[in-house]
Structure formats: structure tokens, C-alpha cells
Amino acid sequence: MAAPAQPKKIVAPTVSQINAEFVTQLACKYWAPHIKKKSPFDIKVIEEIYEKEIVKSRFAIRKIMLLEFSQYLENYLWMNYSPEVSSKAYLMSICCMVNEKFRENVPAWETFKKKPDHFPFFFKCILKAALAETDGEFSLHEQTLLLLFLDHCFNSLEVDLIRSQVQQLISLPMWMGLQPARLELELKKTPKLRKFWNLIKKNDEKMDPEAREQAYQERRFLSRLIQKFISVLKSIPLSEPVTMDKVHYCERFIELMIDLEALLPTRRWFNTILDDSHLLVHCYLSSLVHREEDGHLFSQLLDMLKFYTGFEINDQTGNALTENEMTTIHYDRITSLQRAAFAHFPELYDFALSNVAEVDARDSLVKFFGPLSSNTLHQVASYLCLLPTLPKNEDTTFDKEFLLELLVSRHERRISQIQQLNQMPLYPTEKIIWDENIVPTEYYSGEGCLALPKLNLQFLTLHDYLLRNFNLFRLESTYEIRQDIEDSVSRMKPWQSEYGGVVFGGWARMAQPIVAFTVVEVAKPNIGENWPTRVRADVTINLNVRDHIKDEWEGLRKHDVCFLITVRPTKPYGTKFDRRRPFIEQVGLVYVRGCEIQGMLDDKGRVIEDGPEPRPNLRGESRTFRVFLDPNQYQQDMTNTIQNGAEDVYDTFNVIMRRKPKENNFKAVLETIRNLMNTDCVVPDWLHDIILGYGDPSSAHYSKMPNQIATLDFNDTFLSIEHLKASFPGHNVKVTVSDPALQIPPFRITFPVRSGKGKKRKDADGEEDDTEEAKTLIVEPHVIPNRGPYPYNQPKRNTIQFTHTQIEAIRAGMQPGLTMVVGPPGTGKTDVAVQIISNIYHNFPEQRTLIVTHSNQALNQLFEKIMALDIDERHLLRLGHGEEELETEKDFSRYGRVNYVLARRIELLEEVKRLQKSLGVPGDASYTCETAGYFFLYQVMSRWEEYMSRVKNSGTACPDAAPDAAQVATFFPFHEYFANAPQPIFKGRSYEEDMEIAEGCFRHIKKIFTQLEEFRASELLRSGLDRSKYLLVKEAKIIAMTCTHAALKRHDLVKLGFKYDNILMEEAAQILEIETFIPLLLQNPQDGFSRLKRWIMIGDHHQLPPVIKNMAFQKYSNMEQSLFTRFVRVGVPTVDLDAQGRARASLCNLYNWRYKNLGNLPHVQLLPEFSTANAGLLYDFQLINVEDFQGVGESEPNPYFYQNLGEAEYVVALFMYMCLLGYPADKISILTTYNGQKHLIRDIINRRCGNNPLIGRPNKVTTVDRFQGQQNDYILLSLVRTRAVGHLRDVRRLVVAMSRARLGLYIFARVSLFQNCFELTPAFSQLTARPLHLHIIPTEPFPTSRKNGERPPHEVQVIKNMPQMANFVYNMYMHLIQTTHHYHQTFLQLPPAMVEEGEEGQSQETEMEAEEETVSAQGNLTPSPADASLSQETPAAQPDCSSQTEDTSAPCDIATAAEPVSAAAEAATPQDAESVPTETE
């Protein structure tokens, strides 16, 4: 197998390069935003830039990046565009800038939307240029860029401006391009289209000739473009050299065709045009397909196009076609061919009279039609309306090969899509893993196209939706598997021994050489399948390794996935491995196959089952694992061996590799998706079209739902009637009781709901439009029935005063339908979620709610808040791992709940025993739940009924007299039982009050027996597993899990009969599209319908998306787009929370520009912590400029493992300064945008202050991506980069970075780089308005009483650079130590001898510690050149380090830092460093 060439990484230009560039000088003169006096617009500038900078450099990305970064498009090109100045250079410049924006994944159409007037003219010019001759004004390379621009347009149909232009190209009138017979056939198939067609013809007749000609040009554009492509394709020879421009043009063209076919609005009309052009036949017969090197990607793209042209969908209705319907279409085609043959071609009588199954295979068709002449074939095709009729006495102009392929490919039997999927192996093999076209390297730049599906706004059918996600999920995991294989195998250092075998010169923790491999079982296939049902093998390895690694291998559990690898190295013993060179040829990797562990074998060869019993101790170091192989892959390999004489792969394996369990769940998720595609997945009708991206996006909003609920009990949502009135501005609130004393929560609210034609319209936010009718809400206060006399009987209540927007979100969540809540940072997303859950629980006690989150941390936060509300904990259940992190003493996992039920049962039976005793009833009523039930029925209930009868009858003697309150207490039968409740139970003030108390007491008793009846199942079910299943299926009302757990366990949950009515998703914008979809289908449909009633998604699409490690999948396939984000883009109504209560108002301003209307809650202005300044620091937020330290800015020891020593030291110095002032270390977190910097900062903290009790460690040192969803009072942020902005250019990452701090944010960065970035301007314009040097007030200790923004009474010191700060902190620390020492001597008055003795002991101890620490940290720590630089900059602050023995954890020379590559970084491999462009962990 040929090793793929290593792609080159695109290096972004540095600041100095940017400044030196000719383009930058022009930008500063004509369009740079920071320049006040700009030169007037000059068209020659555009011509010059295009010719000299873009064309001359062969459209080099570096040049185009520079132009786009300088805001060339926004500030010069489009701002000055008009038909008068339009030219080739102008058009191409705009196209290049738009394409670059899409490559960088930044919004591209905003500029055009602001000034849309000339866009139609510009678009027409693009169309004209795309059809120009390739050897004319526009080169093929330029036309390829135009195709890419058109592709972006077709994929941006959600933008009104673009859609209005594209619709002129693709609509019913484009069928003008069909041959007349084919047009007639299509109109006959769909009769309603004929009416529209006649209307179009009429309208065309009314148009003036010029407009008609223009319309015809647009309608025939794609037909003409296809013809142009075919001519380019035919110009490529079979073996002679070919320019890559032609190949790239063809690849981009097929990509455009795929995208047009994969979108229903474009496919509806275009698929017929494409079919009529026979493009696929031309492509499959072309020379390019047969050119191995150049045509590989083209062939893969062509297969994708073939798949989509024959997709199982009705183009006109958009309905998915069933297997039977597809078979009927196939039979109709064959029979129409047979009819034509029978009527007109006597030589085809045998074919015409055969049954379909005999003649629809490719071989049969070739046998029948191959002998026919070209003219005859043409006539057959013309009878089927595939080609125009052949005139009499004329020969066909088509090749016989083309005509034969046209008929055969159209009529051959097809394998159904689901069959293909079921035959596909789930594990990747070496052919896929190292195929750069489908699994690109981390260096993917976004330039070329790839044979990958794209996730855009719309999908053809649910099958298409699942299939695209299936393929992308599979390939994304393949990319991670490739990284693991390359890391493990290269660590093992496979070399060729002198006898030609393999010798391993190294070792790897995650891989072991295989001693023996045997296939032990190949089970028979199921009926109708040709692959075995099961294939099992035994793998033996020798675990001569450290104990903890041995434990890891022996700890492999059932269903863990491993990989079997064959290496045949050709390099001799001792050859060094070079990571920069292709991996495969260095290690000689030949095969990779996946397997799934069944278990380890014991001494007798039996599988050791997973379970609570301890594992047997096995002797020796040899271990054998029984594994399941992929039956589909095994079948393919065996077929290849038998038919083609290939080597038996299963005799060759010599390495087994395991993976981290956390990253190794891909097979289970793929199986889940495949199972979904094999079942009739029933999505609720009200969601189906929205998920596919069609129809009215607001159709699932509660205001449009037919089953909208008029009256809702808001329970404890409102704190008072005033709160309720404030929550519904613009509504008339009518309370059913007039007494203010009775207008107390809880409230039931009746909303005006009308259906049919008079239904109220809602705007995009779900707010009702003003109508003539008054918006009247009828509010009914109601009293929660008394639950008993004990304090714990009182319900827990909500204490949060929700804003009116939060109330709208809660109201929407309680109603049936789809609710989308956009929650900016600090706006109370979790509180809203918990209140919705509580309200659904109380309003619909029979319904079950599923909670799904992205992370265990979010699930824990939800659970901690749910427990604070009035929800019975026996109805809560948590599935999956992570519950151990819950900060509560209660265990909500399955077995935790089982234990709770068993313990609670015993408690309740004790209560029954006490009740029995108090009533003087003999026997053992509390023996079981069953006996307790009989006791309640015969002893308790009878007494209660008798009591009620006596109390009522006591008032009948004198009908006019009011019932006597005293008799309520007198006749009460349970006085003795309630003797331990707060006394007196009955107040004696009124009959009604006492009667309510008596009923409350009975409710308390009744609840005991109700719970025991529920717990009765735990007496009947004996095993913990059965009990936990019962809890899941019957008992729990609120079930929580992560999206990953849902994807892994869907099969088990469905099998158990799991049911739910509502789904609430937190962190919805961070969940992968497919992982959001799977939880909708964790239950079987009832009578063919889904029972799902509500889907509430809460998230923030302006923060970071799901983590996708491979850049190609992230950008090219848009795999990072969550379902939540897609719904927002499609236009589904959202409730946008608009008041934050986390951060100071000034900090909120750094990111609130990204949201519609984000304000602050009142307490942000009022509470002292927000109004007080940050002690010792002049500003509450500041951007601090960091220049090169020792001539170095950013460094990159491994790919994408960026570090910046100067910033790292500066950040740690500020942290130490704050701690020395008295700030609690746990209130400070250090964030950075790259993993490399994170490791460097951690190293420096370990060296500087980690073990120092005066300073300590910050709360967290981590990346911005990992810190999403968390917060702290003070954030120190390092942006690392000095050459290019990098991935902070993604505004979502900027929003996360700016919104983590509550009280103080201090950012360390190269200001000259970041301030010029267009996307970051709103935040950086505020940051750069303040001084760019750190301003500190060293004499102001923490906490301070100074108000934020006040000028301090103390002197402000300006820190110019990192070395100055480092020395300042060192001196401050020494001063503090001396002051403390002086205090000890003066005030504690210790005897001098003790002081000296103590100092001496401490000195010796700390010296020894310092020595150990120094050796462990660096081996041999010598002063670095930083000493010299420090002494030059700050001569006064150069202490004598040698005398420092009082506390060596202080920085000896604080600038003598770790080297740019930290200790951790040096050892880091690409796997450890996670060399990921997105730099997420």
C-alpha cells in the first residue's frame, strides 16, 4: 500500500511579515479601519493587487489570508462595488475573499447584506464568467474558484439575498433544458406540474425580448455548465501528463453537483436535468476515473454523486421511498425496456419475454444489448426518452460504449442502501485509516475538496440524516484511531531482524506483541445473509510489564474495543523513527483489523465473566483474551483470499493495541445509529420536518401546537402576585380573589388560547402580537393541601425571582412542543431548566421526563438544584458514570436508588409498626409491604372513615350551629401516633383549620402506605439488576443521563421498554448533532406514533461547539454544528434570556455585543462585591501587552502545541502578586487558549509557588475550551499567539474566554496582532481603550473598600514588562517574609535561643527540599540568560539568591523560568499534546 505524501502545514504570516507586506502598506493607505485619513477609491489598486499579489503567487493562501485579514472585502471591495467599476479582477478578488472567509469559517455574507443593491448584477457576472471558455479571459484555475463560490452560494439558502438569486437558476422553468420527449414524460408523471408549466409559458410570452433572453440564460445555466464540464473532462488523456488545474476543476464540479443533489429545494428540479445530461455515464467512461493517482479523489466523489442521484426519495413530494417502492420503480424501468424491445426490436424477443430476475443483472444486460449496433442502441434509448430521436438514414454521434453503459447502468439491479449499510464493517481498516481524501491529516488547510458528506441546514430524509452522521462519526473516530496506532506502534520501534522477522526495540503502554492468534469459531450465517453471525478468536500476549500496566491489560472488560495490527518492517535494527516522514513505510504496517473483547480466559480456557466476584489469580505472565471479530470484515477478507488468492490476514497479526476507555465508545454509537436506520424510526410528526430543515420553522412552537394547554399550575415559580404581574408585561392580570391577603402563591394561570383561524399569531420570540382583544390572564391562587404535622412535610420552595424572559421560557417548557432557550453566560439557564422540570413533575405527575446533558458536571449541577425543590427523591434516577462527583451524600445511580428503596422500605415498615402499636392492634402488620397494605385497608381506613362520619354527624343535632372545632380533636383516632409531632397539633381556632390539619395527618399516613405499595416490587424481585430495571421502567419520573450514555445504551433501554414523555437538554449547543437526535428515539413507538410531547433545548450557540479533533470534519463537513445551532440558523423561535447576574456590568460589556439584548440583573449593580474595586489593581479588566522575551514570542515544539514563555511567566507573576496581597488562591483561575501553554504554566507554578503556603495554587489552570460552563471571581488569560491570531478568531471561543470572570479579567497578549482582527473588534476596542501596561497598587491589601472606578489614594505603579513584574513580586515576597519574621521575634517574644534553633532547623530543611525540588524539576538547573536581561532592565531589583534560606519555595530568580518547552512538553508526544488545531483537551 502506497504511503500517502505528508501534507504541508500552512504557516500563518507573523506580525512583522504582515507589516512588511506590500498589501499591508496599501491597506494602511486605502482601507485599514484604524487609519483616519484614507486615500480615495482607485480601481487600479484592485487590479494591481489581483495581478501582482494573487495571480502571480498562484492564489497562495498566505496572500489571500493577509488581504482578508486586513478587511479588504468589507472596507474596500464591496463598499465601492458598482456595475460601472466591475471587472474581471474585481469579480475574482471578491470571490477569493468570500471563499477565504468560508475556509476560515467566519461569516461571509454580512457585508453583502448591509449593502445588497448591486449583488444581483455581481451574481450575473459570476454566472457569465463561470461559462466562459477555458482558454479565454478566465483561466481554469479561476473558474474552479468561481465553482467554489457558487457552491458556497447554493449552501447558503438560509440567506435571503443569496436565495433570491439562486432560485432564478433552480426552479421548474429550468426544465427548458430537457429534451422535449423527456419533458413530456416528467410532466405526465406529475400532472399538477403541467398547470404551472403552462403558466410559465404564458408569463414568458408577456416578457420583453431582453428580459426573456436573460431569464433563458439563467434557466439553462446549469445545463450549459454541465456541458462545459463534460468537454473539460473529455480533454483529459488516459496516460499522458495532465495539468492539475483540470483535475481540480472536475473535482470541484462534482462537489457542486453532490451539494445540489443533497438539498431538496435544489434537487427537486435539478435531479431531472442531471439525469437527462447522463453526466454519470460520461464520468464513469472518462479517462480521469482510470488514472490511479490523479483520479482517486474524483472516483470517490463520483461514487457519492451516484449514491445521491439514485437516493430513495420522491423528488417532488420529498417523501422517503420504501424498499418496496424502490423495487417497483426498478421493475417499471425494466418492463418499459422489455415493452420497447418487444414492440420494435425482434432481435431482443428473448430479453422481452424473460422474467425480471433473469435479466436485471449487469452481466445479463450486457449479454443481451452488447451485440446490438450503435444505432439500434440509440433507438432503444430514444424510446425510453433517454436520448433525442435518431433521424432516419443518420448515424448516431454517440459511442457504442456510452450507449451500452447508459442502458445497463439505468436498468441494472441495485443493492438497497440499508443492505449496503448492514454489510459494511464498523471497524476501520488500513485502507480507510490512511486515505487522505476521507480521513485528512491534522494539517488539512481547507484548500482542496474531500470525499466527505456535509452537514448543512437541510437533509433529504431521516435515512440521509442518519447516514451522513454515521459516516462522519465513523471517520472522526478513525482519525483518532490513526493517531493512537501511530503513537503506539512507533513507540514499539518495530525493526526487521537479521532473519527477516520482526523485532520490537521499544515498548508501548497501550500495545503488546501478539504471541499467538487463533480463530476459534465462525458461526453459521442467518437466513438471507451471507456473512457469519459471529466470529471469535483467541489472542495470547505476554504481560512482562510493570504491575499497574499489567492491571490495565487484565482490566479489559467485555465490549472494550482493541485493534489487531500486522507490521512487517523493512528498516534494520536501530533505525531512528522520524515523525515528519510517512508512518506506514517506516514501520511496515500492512493490516489493521478491529475486535471486541469478550473476556480474559482462565487456566481452563473459560471466559472470566465481569461481575462483583473477585477475579481469579492467574499464574505466569501469559494471558489469553477471547475476542469477537467483525463478521462483515471477516467475510470480505475470506472472499478476497479464496477468489483472488490474497494472503489470509488472520494468520499475520503481531501487535494488539487497546485504547483509553473514555475515547473508545465509537463502535457502540455506530451500532446504535445503524440499528436506528434498520428500525422504522418514528420521530413525532410535529418535529419531523423541522429536523430535516423544511416547512415552517415555528410550527413546533407551543403557540402553533393544536394541543396547547390553557391552564397551567406554576407551583412555586412566582414569589408574590407582584412578581407575577411583572412577569407578564403588556397583559391584564385578573385575580379570581379580591382579598390581597389571599393573593399568595402558588398560582394557576389561564392563558387566552384560541385555535383555528382566530389563533393568535406569535413573533419569532414566541411573544404574542398585539391584537385588539385585551391580553387577559386569569390568575387563581390555590392552597397546597396540608401534608402532615411534621416540619419535613412542608414543601421546599423556589426562592429565585425569575425575570419575565425566564418566565416565558418556563411557560414554553411546560407547554407541548419544541422549546429553544438561548442562555448567555450567567443568565440562569440551569435554574430555568430545574423549574421547568419541577413544574412538569407537579402538573403532569403521570409523565416521565428525560434529562440529557453533554457533561457529567452539568448533570451534577442540575441534580444539586433539583434536590432543593419539592420533588420526591424516590422519583429521581441517574444513569451512567459521574454520579460520584455529586456534591451530596445521596446516591442517585441505579444501585444507589435500589439501596434507597430498600432502606426506605424498612423505615416505613417501622412507622407502620409504630402506628399499629399506637392503635393497639395485635399481630405483625409491618412484616412485609403486603401485610402493611392489609393493615391500612382493614384497620387504618376503617378508623378514618368512622372518624369522618362522627365529625360530620356531630353538627347534625342542631343544623344551624357551626361544626365544633373541639370535636375534630376529640374524635381524632391517631393522637398517640402523632405524639412526636410539634404540639398542639390542633390549634382549636376554627373547624376548617383543624379539619385541614386532620386531613393532612391522614395524608401523611396514607403516603406511607402508598410508598410501601410502590416498594412492594422490591420484595418480589430478588436481584439488584431486576430491581434497578423496575425502577428505571416503572418508578422513576425524572431520569438523567449524558448524551454519550444515551447513544451507548439505546439498545438496552429500548429492550427494557423504557418510556418517557418529555426531554430536557442542557448544554444543547455543545452536543453533536447525532448525539442530540438519538435521545429522541430511546423508546419504541406506541401504535406507530411517538409519545414524546415536549422537547426543551437549553444552550448557547454563541459559545463553543462540540469538540471535533480533525479540522477537515470540523470545517469542511461542518461536523461541529450542533442541532441546536442548526435550528437557530433555520429560524426556529427561541427564548433569549436577557439578564445576567454573574459578572460586573463592565465585564459583561466585553461579550454582550454578541447577544440580542443582554443586560444585567439589579444585584450586579447593588451588591458590594460588584461595586468594590479589585484590591491592588487599578482596573477590573485590562489587556496587558507582552512583547518577546529573550527574542522569542510563541514557540511550537510539537504541531499545534503552542507555548509563550513570556506570557506564562507574566501570568504566574500576577497570580503570585494577587495571593501576596491576600486574594484567596482558589478564587483565581488561569486560562489559556492552547494545551502547550497550559502545561508550561503548570510547570512554572510547580517551580515558583505550588508548594508555598503563602501563595499556593490557583483553582484551575486549564484551556478556555475545557473551562466552558465554569466560572471564577478572577481570571488570568494568556492568548499565547504572536504570529497569527489562530483559533481565537472563532468569536465563540472569544465569548467563552471573556465570560468566565465574575469580578476581574486580566488578559496577556500581543496587542498589535489581536487588535487588527475584524471578528474580535467589539471586544478588543474596549480592551485597548485602557492602558496596555499593567497598573498595580501594591500598598492596597485585599479586600479593599475602594469603589470600582475610583482613583485610589495610594500610588499607582505601572509595570512595563514581564521581567519588571517578576522582580517586583520577588522583592514583595522577601519583604513579606522579613516583616513576618520581625513580627514573630518582636510580638511573640520567643526566647532567642529557640528562635535561632527554629531558624536553623528550618533553613536546613528548606535547603534539602530545594535541592530535591530542583533536581526533580530540571535535573540540573543553571541560571538562564534571563539573569542578564533582568539586571539590565531593573538594576535595583537584583537580590542575592544565595542567601535565601528562609523559604526556598520563593522564586530564587523569578525570571529563570522553565525553558520554553516545559518538562511536560518535552516528554509530550502528539498524543499527549493532543496536537489538535482546536486545542481542546
From Swiss-Prot:
Identified in the spliceosome C complex. Component of the XAB2 complex, a multimeric protein complex composed of XAB2, PRPF19, AQR, ZNF830, ISY1, and PPIE. Identified in a pentameric intron-binding (IB) complex composed of AQR, XAB2, ISY1, ZNF830 and PPIE that is incorporated into the spliceosome as a preassembled complex. The IB complex does not contain PRPF19. Within the spliceosome, interacts with SNRPA1, SF3B1, SF3B3, SF3A1 and SF3A2. Residues 1396-1414 have a biased composition (Acidic residues). SUPFAM superfamilies: P-loop containing nucleoside triphosphate hydrolases. The keyword Electron transport does not apply. Residues 417-1481 are annotated as: Required for assembly of the IB complex. Its EC number is 3.6.4.13. GO terms for biological process: mRNA splicing, via spliceosome. ATP binds at Q801, Q806, G826, T827, G828, K829, T830, D831. It is found in: Nucleus; Nucleus, Nucleoplasm. Contains an N-terminal domain with structural similarity to ARM repeat regions; this domain functions as a scaffold for protein-protein interactions, but is not required for RNA binding or for ATP-dependent RNA helicase activity. One of its GO terms (cellular component) is U2-type catalytic step 2 spliceosome. Residues 1-416 are annotated as: Helical region with structural similarity to ARM repeat domains. Belongs to the CWF11 family. The modification N6-acetyllysine is found at K1055. It catalyses: ATP + H2O = ADP + phosphate + H(+). Its main location: nucleus. Keywords: Acetylation, ATP-binding, Helicase, Hydrolase, mRNA processing, mRNA splicing, Nucleotide-binding, Nucleus, RNA-binding, Spliceosome. It comes from the Eukaryota. The keyword Ribonucleoprotein does not apply. One of its GO terms (molecular function) is ATP hydrolysis activity. Involved in pre-mRNA splicing as component of the spliceosome. Intron-binding spliceosomal protein required to link pre-mRNA splicing and snoRNP (small nucleolar ribonucleoprotein) biogenesis. Plays a key role in position-dependent assembly of intron-encoded box C/D small snoRNP, splicing being required for snoRNP assembly. May act by helping the folding of the snoRNA sequence. Binds to intron of pre-mRNAs in a sequence-independent manner, contacting the region between snoRNA and the branchpoint of introns (40 nucleotides upstream of the branchpoint) during the late stages of splicing. This is RNA helicase aquarius. Induction: By retinoic acid (RA).
